[in-house]
From Swiss-Prot:
<keyword id="KW-0694">RNA-binding</keyword>
<dbReference type="GO" id="GO:0005737">
    <property type="term" value="C:cytoplasm"/>
</dbReference>
<keyword id="KW-0378">Hydrolase</keyword>
<dbReference type="Pfam" id="PF03787">
    <property type="entry name" value="RAMPs"/>
</dbReference>
<comment type="subunit">
    <text>Forms oligomers in isolation. Part of the type III-B Cmr ribonucleoprotein (RNP) complex, an elongated RNP with Cmr2 and Cmr3 as the base, with Cmr4 and Cmr5 forming a helical core along the mature crRNA (39 or 45 nt in length), while the complex is capped by Cmr6 and Cmr1. The 5' end of the crRNA is bound to Cmr2 and Cmr3, while Cmr6 and a Cmr1 subunit (Cmr1-1 or Cmr1-2) cap the 3' end of the crRNA.</text>
</comment>
<comment type="similarity">
    <text>Belongs to the CRISPR system Cmr4 family.</text>
</comment>
<protein>
    <recommendedName>
        <fullName>CRISPR system Cmr endoribonuclease Cmr4</fullName>
        <ecNumber>3.1.-.-</ecNumber>
    </recommendedName>
</protein>
<dbReference type="InterPro" id="IPR013410">
    <property type="entry name" value="CRISPR-assoc_RAMP_Cmr4"/>
</dbReference>
<keyword id="KW-0255">Endonuclease</keyword>
<keyword id="KW-0963">Cytoplasm</keyword>
<dbReference type="GO" id="GO:0003723">
    <property type="term" value="F:RNA binding"/>
</dbReference>
<keyword id="KW-0051">Antiviral defense</keyword>
<dbReference type="GO" id="GO:0051607">
    <property type="term" value="P:defense response to virus"/>
</dbReference>
<comment type="function">
    <text>CRISPR (clustered regularly interspaced short palindromic repeat), is an adaptive immune system that provides protection against mobile genetic elements (viruses, transposable elements and conjugative plasmids). CRISPR clusters contain sequences complementary to antecedent mobile elements and target invading nucleic acids. CRISPR clusters are transcribed and processed into CRISPR RNA (crRNA), formerly called psiRNA (prokaryotic silencing) in this organism.</text>
</comment>
<keyword id="KW-0540">Nuclease</keyword>
<dbReference type="GO" id="GO:0004519">
    <property type="term" value="F:endonuclease activity"/>
</dbReference>
<dbReference type="InterPro" id="IPR005537">
    <property type="entry name" value="RAMP_III_fam"/>
</dbReference>
Amino acid sequence: MKAYLVGLYTLTPTHPGSGTELGVVDQPIQRERHTGFPVIWGQSLKGVLRSYLKLVEKVDEEKINKIFGPPTEKAHEQAGLISVGDAKILFFPVRSLKGVYAYVTSPLVLNRFKRDLELAGVKNFQTEIPELTDTAIASEEITVDNKVILEEFAILIQKDDKGILESVVKAIEQAFGNEMAEKIKGRIAIIPDDVFRDLVELSTEIVARIRINAETGTVETGGLWYEEYIPSDTLFYSLILVTPRAKDNDMALIKEVLGKINGKYLQIGGNETVGKGFVKVTLKEVTNNGGTHAK
């Protein structure tokens, strides 16, 4: 199956909104129902890519419609040539007692990443990630007295006898490039799934927003609300799968157009005018031998 691997690295706090709720946070972020992990839904990402290619890269609308499908009102006429998957979380930044912050992940997250790579035909991430219950595997640069201390969690370190951290860094380099691998190297903490879940639920950014009445200078009735943001320095990944219907000339068109997003900066989610939602994108084409290479 022809596929492209997309990396999304948040440069500013990002709000892929899920609508309003009656809870403490009025405008929460998108989350997977079964895990509670932050996610950027495929339809949201598809819209961002489509808009960027049309408005910034000035790609011909006929080409965009062929690749992404026609606008909603004409969706019945034909299907697009690609399927844009949900952007799943891979690394989440958390305050660390040593090293300022760490990139945390978990066995569940890494094994899902491995599974998704295999779906796209990439089989060069073969390391088995062990189940962790009360210990972590972490870079030496962020450990203190044989522990990694993340927010209020102090987790004992187990020896990395199988070179798991090195394998993870290598996989990140192959998937997202050397720049990303160097960024996370020395800051990785593979922690128990339950602790990871708690951190991605409790360590997002909650921001109070206020709407002021211009005439009175006071807060309008109902003008105070709370928004949730994914923090800067979070890494997501997504797969773009090409339909088997695509012919050779279609493949060339897809490669030409999608290649324009590699290394570029996109805006995802709400509050663009206050600097939110800027991400850096990487794009890797899955090769026939199961590896990846940059576009």
